[in-house]
Amino acid sequence: MICDGSESSGLVCGAFGLTAEPGAALIPVSRGAMGRVWRLDAGAERYAVKELFWESDEESVRTEAAFTAHLESAGIRLPGSLPGRGGRFLQELAPGQDGGWLRLYRWIDGVPVDLAGPGLAAAIGDLAGRLHALARPAGGPVDPWYDTVPAPATWDQLADAARGQGAGWAEAMAGRAGLLCDLADLVTRMPGDRLVTCHRDLHPDNVLVEASGELAVLDWDDAGPACPDRELAGLLMFWHGHDDGTADDAAVRRTLAAYRAGGGPGQLRDEQSFGMYLACRLNFLEAQASVALDPGAAPEHRAYASSEISDTLARLPAPSLISHLTSLAAATLG
């Protein structure tokens, strides 16, 4: 584990062959379920440092780095990966630093997206279209995280376990068990003949707006085999679906038109097109519940997981919204 002191900034600089300038500093930026992001200020240079809470492997990281380098060379804005000691992109922290793994990237200056901003709906559609047009063939099978879901009994079991620990989200989980099962019924295996390498998490939190107005895509750790149809469906839900079960129809149309104009091949065929979005939501929910209920997990991780569970349960999409977006996409794309 690293912190914002000079010792940690020196450790990071050493791991990646950077000069530890006087005054070098690590500034916390954000955290997610899988890791924490820091900004490293080293003299005139700035870098993004990702501290991973869970183990990764060098081979998959190298595949990701090669893919993002391909996209960057074609004009996609993203934080390129930088290697460290021994040419390795993944640097392991010593047991004395409580373990963990580090990645280093070029820093990108930008601001979070404003979902109501003029031109954003078209901009994200164009970006997604270009990403899919530039995508490389899938390098292997789909990870089950993206097209399988927990068994129907899982949600009641987790709710019971949460009640036993007095967890604040227990009743919300129990009350949503029926909806979770209905959503799970829409998840099917991805067709192998339409797989390409996708980002697989095109959430607004993973996109920045640069000073030029260009969009930059962050967090490529999960890039891998997926169907463009399903990534497009998830994008519509992430960017234009509302918690009250409605959608911004005009924005959806602008995104879809720009997606197709940008070369995107995706087509929402039916409600099952939302399968990847739903599988990720449900698997994330189960994974966070496992962390929150684990007495051996770090208190910081348990608290974060509990917060994510409550947020995810509150934002589950209504089946009617999925049907509406499917019909709207069919009418727009033909």
Residue positions per predicted region:
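Active-site acidic catalytic loop and adjacent metal/ATP-binding pocket
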Residues: 31-44, 48-49, 81, 184-230, ...
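ATP/Mg2+ or Mg2+-diphosphate-binding catalytic cores
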Residues: 149, 161-164, 284-334
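ATP-binding pocket architecture of kinase catalytic cores
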Residues: 42-140
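Conserved NTP-binding catalytic cores of kinases and kinase-like/nucleotidyltransferase enzymes
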Residues: 1-85, 210-212, 329-334
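Active-site activation/catalytic loop segments of kinase-like enzymes and analogous catalytic loops
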Residues: 229-264, 278-296
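An alpha-helical support segment within catalytic cores of ATP-dependent transferases
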Residues: 5-16, 139-141, 153-200, 321-332
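All-alpha amphipathic helical-bundle segments outside canonical DNA-binding/catalytic cores
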Residues: 266-277
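A cross-family kinase active-site recognition segment
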Residues: 114-172, 195, 303
